[in-house]
Design a protein with these regions (language model features):
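Bacterial N-terminal signal peptides that target proteins for export
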Residues: 1-12
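Flexible glycan-contacting loops in extracellular carbohydrate-active proteins
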Residues: 179-203
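Bacterial N-terminal signal peptides
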Residues: 11-20
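Short carbohydrate-recognition loop motifs
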Residues: 43-65
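Short tryptophan-centered beta-strand motifs in secreted/extracellular beta-sheet-rich domains
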Residues: 81, 155-162, 167-169
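Short, aromatic/His-centered strand-loop micro-motif at the edge of beta-sheets
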Residues: 133-157
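Secretory/extracellular carbohydrate-interaction modules
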Residues: 60-131
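Extracellular carbohydrate-recognition regions
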Residues: 24-43
Length: 209
């Protein structure tokens, strides 16, 4: 290979790698070893991850549906993906932190629903933050709810950006913001959960700032 061309290729590669660092961000597409799943039947193809489950399975797991976690820690950053659900059931974006060496809830976004397990509301989006209670293993839960509905059977581009005490949630052309001091805590893993039915996801990216 011509030496000048070789040097140009190396220089271009170094530029592509260096630019994100100069801008203070690292873009990560989670690998298989950074991904885990609880419950549900998984199939993958053409860049789409499909997780299927039934109401019977949901009830057998103490009313918990399938969840996929991405183990990419960050303090400031963005979790983004596109998703599609075949039922009018809530889809939950989950962020976990660590307390005393154990995973602990940090932040949740309930799309088409609320944290209440028996709720059938599908015209709201709910944001849940958690505050530690001194001397207790339990946490104080704060819920903020707004009117919103994501259409069934359609792809929805979604992202959650955490920066200091601010969470910015974008779903298609809608943007929501939540402030809470607890959001300053480090995320050890984030993911997506649904009750039952088929949830498809693609284009999962985590950007660390």
């Amino acid at each position: 290979m011509n030496k000048k061309i070789s040097n140009l290729i190396v220089t271009s590669w170094m530029f592509l790698v260096t630019v994100p660092f100069l801008l203070g961000e690292i873009k990560i597409i989670p690998m298989d070893q950074q991904t885990s799943m609880k419950w549900g039947k998984l199939s993958e193809g053409n860049g789409i991850r499909k997780v299927e489950s039934t109401e019977a399975e949901y009830n057998s797991h103490n009313r918990h549906g399938p969840i996929t976690y991405y183990h990419v820690p960050f303090s400031k950053g963005t979790f983004s993906l596109s998703w599609k659900h075949d039922l009018t059931k809530k889809v939950v974006l989950v962020f976990e932190t660590e307390v005393n060496g154990k995973p602990s809830h940090l932040f949740k976004v309930f799309i088409n629903g609320t944290p209440a397990k028996n709720s059938t509301k599908s015209d709201v989006i709910s944001f849940v933050t958690y505050k530690s209670i001194p001397g207790s293993k339990k946490k104080k839960v704060n819920v903020t709810t707004e009117k919103y509905h994501a259409e069934v059977g359609e792809w929805h581009e979604t992202s959650v950006t955490l920066s200091d005490d601010l969470a910015t949630i974008r779903i298609d052309d809608r943007t929501f913001t939540i402030r809470d001091e607890s959001l300053r805590n480090k995320v050890i893993k984030c993911g997506i959960n649904h009750k039952w039915g088929t949830l498809e996801t693609k284009d999962v990216i985590i950007v660390k700032n």
